[in-house]
Amino acid sequence: MNYEFERETGFINSQPSLAECLTSFPPVGDAFQSSSIKSSTLSHSTLIPPPFEQTIPSLNPGSHPRHSRPKQNPNGSCPLPAASLPPEYPWMKEKKASKKNQTTSTAATTDPGPLYFSPQGSPEISDGGSGATRRLRTAYTNTQLLELEKEFHFNKYLCRPRRVEIAALLDLTERQVKVWFQNRRMKHKRQTQCKENHHGDGKPPSLEEAGGRGDGKSFFEQVANNVSGALLEREGYPFQQNTLTSQQSQNGHNSDSQSATVSPLGSNDKHLKHFPNPSPTVPICTTTMAPDCASAQDNGSPSALDVSLQDFNVFSNDSCLHLSDAVSPSLSESVDSPIGLTTEAFDFFSETLTTIDLQHLSY
């Protein structure tokens, strides 16, 4: 009895008896200790380890070791699959979700056909069956393209803060925005080069056509401007011309008709300097005749009339044509050209010359 009592009291109070109880079930204790350590280190706060009383069977009151052994085994075997499979953290879930999205996007892009186009229009062959991993082309939405085009209109090159801001605004990555702007700059460069080449090839014929159509109008405008300039000069020096013509009429009786005809030409050369392109012969003849008529009417003397008649005989239309044929064949060709003077233009010149004569009659 005493031995049993000592044994019982020693079993309850003494530490060696507790050590004996702990070492009496070595496989069970090792299994529970290792599993609880693994589960606590792997799961940190997600998995709660079993209580201390369950790990040590001798401290659990009213439980026999034999009865507790089958209870401990299933509890010990539960953390083992958790230890073999690591728990899922939020960053792991995001990674798996992105992988799933990539696989679904690849399936969606490869199903319609083996070739698909980017927003810029360049095709790319998709690797449907091959295992090679190629970077997928970004399919931009209409709103994203609109905002990117708007930004490109104002800024061809983006600074990094603005690029980050646009990427966050349009739900794109910074790399996608950078690559889009690179491609858009190259597209803009190609478009400008094509436009320059097109305009460079198309400019000469357009200028020739415009020149061919506007030759007649420009010629008449030049002649009208020159006539007006000559009028201004003649109005500035009316009295000098009258004195010159009077002297010429006095010298006409003493000298030959040729000298009388040469002197008005000298005065008319001043007015002919204003004509940059005196290609047609008819305006030249009319301008040479008109000042002579004006001088004759201003003087009113019969000698001046004789000189003017001689000028008319010398510088008739036929003589002008013969002179032009003798000087240059291009002038005769210009008369036969379709840009030649019409009756309306001739009437216009005659009317202007008559107005010139009427103005000088007042003096």
UniProtKB/Swiss-Prot annotation:
Gene3D superfamilies noted in UniProt: Homeodomain-like (1.10.10.60)
Subcellular location: Nucleus
Database matches in InterPro entries: HD, HD_metazoa, Homeobox_Antennapedia_CS, Homeobox_CS, Homeodomain-like_sf
One family name in Pfam for this protein: Homeodomain
Biased composition (Basic and acidic residues): 193-202
Listed SMART domains: HOX
GO terms (BP aspect): regulation of transcription by RNA polymerase II
Sorted UniProt keywords: Developmental protein, DNA-binding, Homeobox, Nucleus, Transcription, Transcription regulation
PROSITE patterns: ANTENNAPEDIA (PS00032), HOMEOBOX_1 (PS00027), HOMEOBOX_2 (PS50071)
Region (Disordered): 42-132, 186-218, 245-279
A single GO molecular function term of this UniProt record: DNA-binding transcription factor activity, RNA polymerase II-specific
Protein family per UniProt: Belongs to the Antp homeobox family. Proboscipedia subfamily.
Biological function: Sequence-specific transcription factor which is part of a developmental regulatory system that provides cells with specific positional identities on the anterior-posterior axis.
Name listed for the protein in its UniProt record: Homeobox protein Hox-A2b
Source organism of this protein record: Danio rerio
